[in-house]
Amino acid sequence: SKHSLYEYFLIPKGIDYKKYNSVKWLPDECFVNYKTKTGYIIEKKFQNSPGSVDEKLAACDFKRREYLKLFSLLDYDVEYIYVFNDWFKQPKYKDVLAYIRAVGCYYYFDEIPLSCIGL
């Protein structure tokens, strides 16, 4: 569920998001690599027509920082990753894709390479 990050990782470790974030951010998926002490926030964006997702893509840096407030309490880092379908290969996304990388976030098309999450 979208609440798994909280139910299975943060709450059992005594982290109450309300003390650090004004919003309970709900990632599509979260993978925690205990060996590298990194939380991977994974957002899936699969479009087949124009929509409101376009503006949301540039929020990755802000959201990564929001998650980092929680993970850093446990000495964990955070990586923010988008998984896109081919819709986002259109030229009109060139600038936002460049921005995503420029601010230290990542994106992949269709699937995430295991090496990206430390496996």
Task: Please tell me what each predicted stretch does.
Residues 1-35:
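Active-site metal-binding core of divalent-cation-utilizing nuclease and nuclease-like domains
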Residues 29-33, 38-47:
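Conserved catalytic cores of phosphodiester-cleaving nucleases, focusing on short active-site segments
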Residues 33-36, 68-74:
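Amphipathic alpha-helical interaction segments
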Residues 43-57, 83-87:
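Short beta-strand-loop-alpha-helix junction that forms the active-site gateway
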Residues 53-72:
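Short, charged, amphipathic alpha-helix that recurs within catalytic cores of restriction-modification
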Residues 72-119:
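Domain-level recognition of nuclease-like catalytic cores that cleave nucleotide substrates
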